[in-house]
């Protein structure tokens, strides 16, 4: 109680300050003790030491020669400024303390670490003191230091205003009489100050004492009766109920509790035996026997009673409906009772009536002052009730917001799942569609054919897949007359086309050539021109060397016997591989010779429907009927082929006579081949005119004199072909073909 008499020294404060700023501590802030610093601040706030003495003690340690002590002293001063109270701030802002700090900042002998730390905290304190006018001296010194060139760090964030707000005990008020009972102070009736409110009372009105933690006072001090009543200390005099696990209990208390439990158990057992005497047999042996002589008889009886109670209970758990509901203590509430509500309503109605009458005289309402006192008494509880309801409303609103957010998040999750499922379905559908497209593309993609699969003559006949070979149908004679034939008539022996040929079934392939789908239908091909499509030979203006000849061209020094020619043809037919499309090729002696595709890889292949004739008929036609072609045949050949002088000279003896008719048939087949150009209609008209002009000339071949068998002349053989007989044939016909055909037709007529 030394602080009550205003003592200048406090050993406890000095001890704590020395402990917090000891030179034996580790470098700052490794050994900073926050608990000790707060105890020092509480002593200053509770006025256990005078603020001036506390300031001087801290100043002495800040001015120490030890840099470590200085740094810990500056940290302790900062803690005391924030928790010491306004009375300590006045001493900190005094000229004595501020000058000491400014001198340390300006001194050159100060340690750099101490100087930097002092500048930092000096700036923080100055910025915090700007809001208080009584601390303006500290701010003025701070501005002077900045103006003098002292470098301060950048200003920190605005310091909160409540940082320096500290609850401290109020200042004492002096008076000549007690402020409660109004009794004058005398020599015997001394005055006392309440440490809670600062007012002055006599002994009768301030006889209570209690600690004041809110002011940093941990020991009991004098308070008045009013502060005592407000704190509710009179209700706290009764002993508080013991809380299990928190209140220390002695062995005697435990023994007393055990004895009490035994007595209650015995009483309950005796009561149950009296009520249910018929359920127990007196000859029942005890469940527990005393084996120790000093065993307490009451303990044994209590244990037996407890065991019997456990056996009497059913082993099965009780149903949910039979389980006793736990009793919950009602929550504290500030709701008004019905009587209090009635009191407030009555007072409110009374005041409304007085306002309606406009009278200020309370004599007509004698109970108004009583109602006012009762309403005033209930007012505090009503305010707390309103605050409680407002708090609950705020909590419910926050819970509602959280529920709304949860619902929104759940909806977003569901939307995301649906969108993801739709996206997956769309991707799966697109993937299946691509698989189907790739499957169809692979299934209908034309398979490439190797060069070795083509027939030796370089042509391939089209036969619809999965169809057997069928003999050619006999053509009417009238139709044969109208169709101009490119072959001369045989006067000696005419092959019988109407006789049934030898039927053959050729192996079929599962696929067809990709060009076969563009071939013309068989019904549109004239019977006389039904032959494999050949290549259109462009006119060659330069002479061909005599040494360069086709493989199939043969020069005869003497007539070749028919048997040898037939044997060569049979060997050629036997060595020819089958067609790629499944139908056997028809090798005609007058047809172009086979082409080596290795030397002509780019030659386009054209296919047409060819009514194939049996091989035996073809052999009999050309083996037994050598013919002589009159001179008019050369004119017809000149109408459809280049002139003889542009193709070279004849061989001395001649070549195979059937080669000329083969070239004519190739030229006719190239005219029948469909062209994708818009000039197809004009070409068709030109072809029909040339065929009508060539028909009377063909009829004259039968009337001319034929040479005997085995005799040939120069006119019976065609001109030698150029070496490039099978170049890359163009798909389109030459543009000047129609004009040349018309001129040739006019020359023939002349």
Swiss-Prot record:
One GO molecular-function entry: zinc ion binding
Cellular component annotations (GO), alphabetically ordered: early endosome; endosome membrane
UniProt keyword annotations, A-Z: Endosome, Membrane, Metal-binding, Repeat, Zinc, Zinc-finger
Zinc finger annotations (FYVE-type) as residue ranges: 172-232
GO biological-process terms attached to the record: endocytic recycling; intracellular protein transport; receptor internalization; vacuolar transport
Start-end of Polar residues biased regions: 491-501, 596-606, 613-635
Domain of life of the organism encoding this protein: Eukaryota
Record text on subunit structure and interactions: Component of the ESCRT-0 complex composed of HSE1 and VPS27.
Protein name, entry field: Vacuolar protein sorting-associated protein 27
Organism: Cryptococcus neoformans var. neoformans serotype D (strain JEC21 / ATCC MYA-565) (Filobasidiella neoformans)
